[in-house]
């Protein structure tokens, strides 16, 4: 069982002015056989606050996967990708590229997604759009590889690759 942390980036949500349907969607889609939610928070669209929370959670022993929602667009306050990049040890660009490629089949707006994916220590961090629809579509793409990616992060060798 892997520890899951869900971080919703929304100033209005952090002030209680907006329901967090996208964060709830992440929990609903991932919690179960492979994942247990160990952290959940709604924070404002502030780069330092986001970076600090990502680093804190990634460095915790019980967090294997952090999934964020919100702040990946082109808006003036959308700084989640920059905050994430500031704390990553390595990017995993293929996951973000796959999410964009697949969601482009549903909407041309996928071209302006700035989602990033990477690792800090042994923790995988995935940034998702703020919409519930975007969360579902993107997670559908990467869910099949997340457990294997986490296994790779937690041991030196993996003898079998999933097909």
PLM regions with names:
Residues 1-163:
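Non-catalytic beta/alpha edge segments that cap or flank active sites
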